[in-house]
Amino acid sequence: MDHLEFDENTDSEYSIFEEDNDYGLHGLDDSVGFTDLFDAPNIYRVYSWLHKHYNQKKGQLKHGVSRQKNKLQPIHKQINYETDKLKERLGKSIDKFQEQWNSGKVVRFRDKLSFALGVSTCILTALLVGMAPESMHLWYTIQLFVYLPLRYYTYQRKGYEYFIADFCYWGNILLLVYIWIFPESRRLFILSYSISYGTLAWSVVAWRNSLLFHSIDKITSLFIHFFPPLVLHTIVHLTNKSYLKDRFPAVLKVKKIDLLSSVEIASFFYALWQIWYYFFIQVGKQKQIQEGRPTSFTWLSKAYSKTKLGRAVAKLPQNLQPFVFMIIQYLYSITTMLPCSLWYNNKLYSTAFLALIFGWSVWNGASYYIDVFGRRFQKELEALRQQLAETPTNSGSSSALSR
């Protein structure tokens, strides 16, 4: 039997089968018979040859796939590059907008606008009190529908939205309900008057409200606490009885505010609010509060932490502090309502009380402008002195400046 000849140096670029030779095995001699393929050595050599070419084709296939991946890789990189570029462009646009908003020019314009509106509001309010007191409730309503949505928007953006659930906002809504829905309700009038002249008015002192014309936030806080008693002062003491008879009949029915009845009505309303506040805020939003969302309780705890009452509350167990705060807030509300009969029965006392509260906010505003701006200017001056002191050539100027 002739030996099977196998070409081991066959070019790997060719196919295993020769297309122009009736599918004969490439690399085998044509003289080999078909029966010779069943010889054991020849079978092994054929197998080796097939295995070698299989591995070569497998390598070529992997190389082709790898080459296609390499071709697609630049496209993939280009897509990632364009995506990152788009993200960067959007980020820069947002940063640019934020920078423009916080820039000195925009802030100055915003402060100027706020200052102009604040001064104009004070002047218009004074004119209405003196010339058209029967229109004060309209002026109050217009401002309330401006300030409350603005307060909700700004506080929600800052994470202060739980302050909106405070008793002061309920007091304003209650007064709005009395003015426009139930002006004939005697009990609702007594409740609104007691809360306005009690809790709301004294909150100017407790919350340290300031008359800062350049700050919408400060003006809003002062409006929420001071305007309700001012509106009721004009209704009770400055409005004609003929107008009251048609528009606010409950005022004429109340000859005087009895302390016991006012405390009883206010206590019932306060209890309803406090129950709602505890379950909706203290319990329902406990996780958010623990994560750092401020409430009136956390703010007052920090603001009065150095006082005797603040230190006493801080020494109590953590789970008891909110309940103690509720009791203190209730006692504060009832205490501030005690002199309401004086304000209601005497026009002069009511005027003096409102002047005192408003003067307190003016003093707080003056303290802010002088102390805060003064300290800021002092820091800038100290930084300038330090900069001049670090420059040897300007030592003379530094000493002259320090004098």
Swiss-Prot record:
Lineage: Eukaryota, Fungi, Dikarya, Ascomycota, Taphrinomycotina
Cytoplasmic side: 1-112, 156-161, 208-218, 284-322, 374-403
Full protein name: Glycerophosphocholine acyltransferase 1
Task of the protein: Glycerophosphocholine acyltransferase (GPCAT) that utilizes acyl-CoA to acylate glycero-3-phosphocholine (GPC), forming lysophosphatidylcholine (LPC). Shows broad acyl specificities with a preference for 16:0-CoA, polyunsaturated acyl-CoA, and the hydroxylated ricinoleoyl-CoA. Also catalyzes the acylation of glycero-3-phosphoethanolamine (GPE) with acyl-CoA. In addition to acyl-CoA, GPCAT efficiently utilizes LPC and lysophosphatidylethanolamine (LPE) as acyl donors in the acylation of GPC.
UniProt-annotated location(s): Endoplasmic reticulum membrane; Golgi apparatus membrane
Positions bearing carbohydrate: 240
Reactions that this protein is recorded to catalyse: sn-glycerol 3-phosphocholine + an acyl-CoA = a 1-acyl-sn-glycero-3-phosphocholine + CoA; sn-glycero-3-phosphoethanolamine + an acyl-CoA = a monoacyl-sn-glycero-3-phosphoethanolamine + CoA; sn-glycero-3-phosphoethanolamine + (9Z)-octadecenoyl-CoA = (9Z-octadecenoyl)-sn-glycero-3-phosphoethanolamine + CoA
Membrane-traversing stretches: 113-133, 138-155, 162-182, 187-207, 219-239, 263-283, 323-343, 353-373
Pfam families in the cross-refs: DUF2838
InterPro entries: GPCAT
EC number assigned by the record: 2.3.1.-
Primary localization class, coarse: endoplasmic reticulum
GO biological process: phosphatidylcholine biosynthetic process
Topology with respect to the bilayer: Multi-pass membrane protein
A Gene Ontology cellular-component term: membrane
EC class of the enzyme, as a word: transferase
Domain of life (superkingdom): Eukaryota
Family, as annotated: Belongs to the GPC1 family.
Keywords carried by this UniProt record: Acyltransferase, Endoplasmic reticulum, Glycoprotein, Golgi apparatus, Lipid biosynthesis, Lipid metabolism, Membrane, Phospholipid biosynthesis, Phospholipid metabolism, Transferase, Transmembrane, Transmembrane helix
GO molecular function terms noted in the UniProt entry: glycero-3-phosphocholine acyltransferase activity
Lumenal side: 134-137, 183-186, 240-262, 344-352
Gene from which the chain derives: gpc1
